[in-house]
């Protein structure tokens, strides 16, 4: 999982999730997993 100041969807299977006040992008492709700091 990479940490970015701005997260975005990369492909169609990416989904935005808000958890504990942080924004996450979860995807089938593990390279697309992101977290906002």
UniProtKB/Swiss-Prot annotation:
<keyword id="KW-0934">Plastid</keyword>
<dbReference type="InterPro" id="IPR000473">
    <property type="entry name" value="Ribosomal_bL36"/>
</dbReference>
<keyword id="KW-0689">Ribosomal protein</keyword>
<dbReference type="GO" id="GO:0003735">
    <property type="term" value="F:structural constituent of ribosome"/>
</dbReference>
<dbReference type="GO" id="GO:0005840">
    <property type="term" value="C:ribosome"/>
</dbReference>
<dbReference type="InterPro" id="IPR035977">
    <property type="entry name" value="Ribosomal_bL36_sp"/>
</dbReference>
<protein>
    <recommendedName>
        <fullName>Large ribosomal subunit protein bL36c</fullName>
    </recommendedName>
</protein>
<dbReference type="Pfam" id="PF00444">
    <property type="entry name" value="Ribosomal_L36"/>
</dbReference>
<dbReference type="GO" id="GO:0006412">
    <property type="term" value="P:translation"/>
</dbReference>
<comment type="similarity">
    <text>Belongs to the bacterial ribosomal protein bL36 family.</text>
</comment>
<keyword id="KW-0687">Ribonucleoprotein</keyword>
<dbReference type="GO" id="GO:1990904">
    <property type="term" value="C:ribonucleoprotein complex"/>
</dbReference>
<dbReference type="GO" id="GO:0009536">
    <property type="term" value="C:plastid"/>
</dbReference>
